[in-house]
Amino acid sequence: MTIQEELEATKQQFCIELNQVNSSKDLFDLKVRYLGKKGLFRCFADKLRECPLDQKALMGASINECKTYIEEQIREKNDSILLAEESAEFLKEKIDITLPGESHCPGGKHIVKKVLDDVVDIFICLGFCVREAPNIESEENNFSLLNFEEDHPARQMHDTFYLDGKTVLRTHTSNVQVRELSKGQPPIKVVAPGLCFRNEDISARSHVIFHQVEAFYLDRDVTLSDLTEMLTEFYHTFFKRKIELRLRHSYFPFVEPGIEVDVSCECRGSGCSLCKHTGWLEVAGAGMIHPQVLRNSGIDPEIYTGYAVGMGIERLAMLKHGISDIRLFCENDLRFLQQFS
């Protein structure tokens, strides 16, 4: 077979293989096979050197013509493949405008956080300053300095989470009161928000973790009337309606006298499920700071008096929004939470 015939056969074989190429990688492999340093045209170069001198010019021209043809076909095929690949990529990224839009779900404050912020803001407007204390507290600050007897039930492990013999997860934010009273002399007017922990059975009305706000005021001649006036203003602002206040005698180790605070229900006494048909909602525990608590902090109870009030934030949220189960606050159910966003 002459070189001319070999070139023609090579061209035909190339065209067959070129038609089967569908990717840039396959085209590159084909180019290397024909035009690479060890490709088919390397053989033609070797044969050209062995060709008689009078035929070299003609054979050289034929080889170059065939090589040029193959190079042009490869360029055209490459352009075609690139265009096809770009079109495929474009179609892949194309937005289907017939698809339904994706709804965005913006975040928002948790209902407990919203109520907590509202409560703290009201107390700030009433002249209180915000103070905080650790969630992990000594038994002394959590109980002893607040006038809890050694055998008080609240000290037992079935009511309190003990980390060791003398360290607990605080059961109330009253530990802030102990720390603030020991810092200096009155007047002291503080609101203390934070988490509390109690070893209780989880139910619709109680949980092992909850938020509490304690507010206390210590100065000369502070009376129970001052407490009543402050509470009336606070709950009127919080519930955004005029309320009546009812105080019931109760016992708390750190106050004397101790009182339970009720506010009039929105049903105006006609009775509803929220107030259990009593016309009243229990909202807080309060009282005048016990003289022994003041002595424990180095303050003379003959000179200074003060009041303290503690309220559960989840309880306030439940009363304000008619929520019947405290467990809902911890379940992260968007159907519930989005009602208050």
From Swiss-Prot:
The keyword Protein biosynthesis applies. One of its GO terms (biological process) is phenylalanyl-tRNA aminoacylation. Pfam families: Phe_tRNA-synt_N, tRNA-synt_2d. One of its GO terms (cellular component) is cytoplasm. Its cofactor is Mg(2+). Keywords: Aminoacyl-tRNA synthetase, ATP-binding, Cytoplasm, Ligase, Magnesium, Metal-binding, Nucleotide-binding, Protein biosynthesis. GO terms for molecular function: ATP binding; magnesium ion binding; phenylalanine-tRNA ligase activity; tRNA binding. It is found in: Cytoplasm. It is an enzyme of class 6 (ligase). It catalyses: tRNA(Phe) + L-phenylalanine + ATP = L-phenylalanyl-tRNA(Phe) + AMP + diphosphate + H(+). Mg(2+) binds at E256. Binds 2 magnesium ions per tetramer. It comes from the Bacteria. Its main location: cytoplasm. Belongs to the class-II aminoacyl-tRNA synthetase family. Phe-tRNA synthetase alpha subunit type 1 subfamily. Tetramer of two alpha and two beta subunits. This is Phenylalanine--tRNA ligase alpha subunit. The gene is pheS.
